[in-house]
Amino acid sequence: MNLILLLVIGFLVFIGTYMILSINLIRIVIGISIYTHAGNLIIMSMGTYGSNKSEPLITGGNQLFVDPLLQAIVLTAIVIGFGMTAFLLVLVYRTYKVTKEDEIEGLRGEDDAK
């Protein structure tokens, strides 16, 4: 299971990097969103797999458990990531409405153009 999770996280980081390096603003926003999902999976994997974790208060039995603190952190990160994605989409939309450009190269000023 660790190998599958590692491959999924690596694939998400690869796709996120590829999308961030594109010149289209929407793809950049989607790439940042994919990065946040990869980060959430990394945090969740820290609490799932480990050595002999058991309940902190119950002494009978050796039931494995998942750390609830990491689940709360990931839930908070999902909400923050959603808000950040919504803000970036509105920013890209407003930039498109003002400049009629949806690519990075078109946003350069006359002084910066080569």
UniProtKB/Swiss-Prot annotation:
**Gene Ontology annotations of biological process type:** monoatomic ion transport
Coiled-coil segments, which residues?
none
Please give the start and end residues of each transmembrane region.
3-23, 28-48, 72-92
Q: What cellular-component terms does GO give this entry?
A: plasma membrane
- The organism is Staphylococcus aureus (strain MRSA252)
Q: How does it sit in the membrane?
A: Multi-pass membrane protein
Which family is annotated?
Belongs to the CPA3 antiporters (TC 2.A.63) subunit C family.
User: One Pfam match, by short name?
Assistant: Oxidored_q2
Q: Which InterPro entries match?
A: CPA3_antiporter_subunitC, NUOK/Mnh_C1-like
Q: What is this protein called?
A: Putative antiporter subunit mnhC2
For molecular function, the Gene Ontology terms on record are:
antiporter activity
The reply on keyword Ion transport is yes
Under the subunit heading, UniProt states:
May form a heterooligomeric complex that consists of seven subunits: mnhA2, mnhB2, mnhC2, mnhD2, mnhE2, mnhF2 and mnhG2.
User: Cystine bridges: which residues?
Assistant: none
User: Does the keyword Iron belong to this entry?
Assistant: no
Q: Where in the cell is it found?
A: Cell membrane
Q: What is its main location?
A: membrane
Gene behind this chain?
mnhC2
PANTHER family, from UniProt? ANTIPORTER SUBUNIT MNHC2-RELATED
UniProt keywords, alphabetically? Antiport, Cell membrane, Ion transport, Membrane, Transmembrane, Transmembrane helix, Transport
